[in-house]
């Protein structure tokens, strides 16, 4: 059970988000895609894929397999992922899930991804890829270069700016979860003095702090 600074138990928000939350996010980004003349956006990172699909998986911790989601200018996102993640993705609101057996050094999902991108280049021949501040491309650079080489005439635009605009405005459901985790973290720091041990290493004290946060109710504390 988690507690606030006065020791009063806090209400725990329901885990995950309703489908309506993902629909809201999709609607917001597609409006900005329309303004920016983008036919699709390619997502490759855990945080971006989770934001638009709700897909959570420890498989992202492994650098072996790439994961792709395409946001079209209209309609629901398409997931193009290794077969190892298919069952988890089917628990989300995503319906179009295409898979390949990974790792496959000869073709680690690139041909499926390329085919889907080409099918979406119908209005502006423009693909959005997060390029700028705080963005990351989570796929082999060689595969990305192969992808771009096989998209002649397609303009690659930065999608990061419009994706950030969507994230800047939080829904009530998001605010509720942010408030909850901030309360837990604050309580953890309040309790910090009580379990620090003089003479122990920073690593040992950090480990104890992380264990305490887990007891208070966080899912993880990576740093």
Q: Can you describe what each PLM-predicted range is?
A:
Residues 23, 137, 199-207, 211:
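An alpha-helix initiation/capping motif
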Residues 182-193, 202-205, 209-210:
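Active-site pocket-lining segments that scaffold enzyme catalytic pockets across diverse folds
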Residues 1-184:
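A composition/biophysics-driven feature that prefers long, compositionally simple stretches
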């Amino acid at each position: 059970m988690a507690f606030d600074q006065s020791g009063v138990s806090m209400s725990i928000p329901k885990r995950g988000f309703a489908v309506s939350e993902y629909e809201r996010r999709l609607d917001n980004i597609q409006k900005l895609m329309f303004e920016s003349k983008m036919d699709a956006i390619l997502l490759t990172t855990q945080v971006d894929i989770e934001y638009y699909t709700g897909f959570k998986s420890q498989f992202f911790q492994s650098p072996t397999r790439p994961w792709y989601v395409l946001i079209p200018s209209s309609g629901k996102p398409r997931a193009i992922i290794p077969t190892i993640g298919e069952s988890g993705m089917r628990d989300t609101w995503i319906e179009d899930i295409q898979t390949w057996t990974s790792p496959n050094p000869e073709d680690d999902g690139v041909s499926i991804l390329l085919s889907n991108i080409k099918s979406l280049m119908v209005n502006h021949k423009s693909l959005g890829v997060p390029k700028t501040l705080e963005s990351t491309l989570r796929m082999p650079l060689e595969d990305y270069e192969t992808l771009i080489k096989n998209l002649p005439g397609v303009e690659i635009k930065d999608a990061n700016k419009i994706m950030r605009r969507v994230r800047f405005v939080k829904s009530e459901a998001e605010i509720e979860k942010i408030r909850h985790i901030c309360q837990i973290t604050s309580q953890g720091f309040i309790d910090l003095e009580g379990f620090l041990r003089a003479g122990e290493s920073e690593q040992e004290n950090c480990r104890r702090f992380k264990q305490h946060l887990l007891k208070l109710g966080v899912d993880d504390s990576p740093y």
